[in-house]
Regions:
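Short terminal alpha-helical segments
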Residues: 1-26
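Short intrinsically disordered terminal tails
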Residues: 1-4, 19, 62, 83-92
Length: 92
């Protein structure tokens, strides 16, 4: 079972990589896997992190078609949080 520490360590590892390099993509997949597992396990803290990330992506000008936005919405939708996903989708 993953926890906050695992997630934060994966984020730190990703930060050390050049953006969009092969190493960064590997680390990003790790971050996304941990986040997905935590939400699937019912971790409300991780759900909050996903929601915060969606707000940040919206503030940065990302669009509904952006991969990061689609992935975060999918995590919510596929774990029984369809209403929250729909609410978040309206920001984009």
């Amino acid at each position: 079972m993953y926890n906050r520490e695992d997630y934060r360590e994966a984020l730190e590892e990703r930060e050390k990589c050049d953006l969009h390099s092969d190493e960064w993509r590997f680390c990003q997949a790790k971050v996304q896997s941990i986040a997905t597992a935590m939400v699937a396990a019912g971790n409300n803290w991780m759900v909050g992190e996903i929601i915060d990330e969606l707000y940040s992506l919206s503030d940065c000008g990302c669009e509904l078609t952006d991969e990061a936005v689609r992935f975060d919405l999918w995590i919510l939708e596929s774990n029984g949080l369809e209403e929250k996903a729909e609410e978040m989708e309206k920001m984009f």
